[in-house]
Amino acid sequence: MKAVLIPGDGIGPEISASVESITKAMNLDIEWVKYRAGAEYAKETGEVWEPGLVDAIEEYKWALKGPTATPIGTGFRSVNVALRQKFSTYANVRPLRNFKGIDSKYENIDLVIIRENTEDLYKGIEYMLTDDIANGVKLITREASTRICRY
């Protein structure tokens, strides 16, 4: 099975190499197809991600992305937000649990936080009112709110 691997920036390539080693050691039938994206790639090429990335994700149906950086003040669009919006991966699911043998201030935690991942400030509707005042619109639609509630 083919899958897209986006190593990303910073520690991303190291994490991605570990993922490749682990999946190989587990004898998983995954052929990782690598594409570059993120701040380092943008600095080199002026593009957010390597050509063909979106088509590959659509073809292979899934991707694993390492951490990517977004330079501040460059007009560079976040890879994370752009991919979320492109593929409508709207649910950010964060499970929280205690683990046996690990001390914690609180006991018996078993909680899942689900956050809408494509609207609010993620829409990127921002502009300067003056040289000293910026405005960011927190757009939230009924459609997206209903969708995340039903998730």
Regions found by a protein language model. Name each.
Residues 1-36:
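N-terminal phosphate-binding or glycine-rich loops at protein starts, especially the Walker A/P-loop
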Residues 1-10, 39-151:
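Anion-binding alpha/beta catalytic cores of soluble intermediary-metabolism enzymes, centered on
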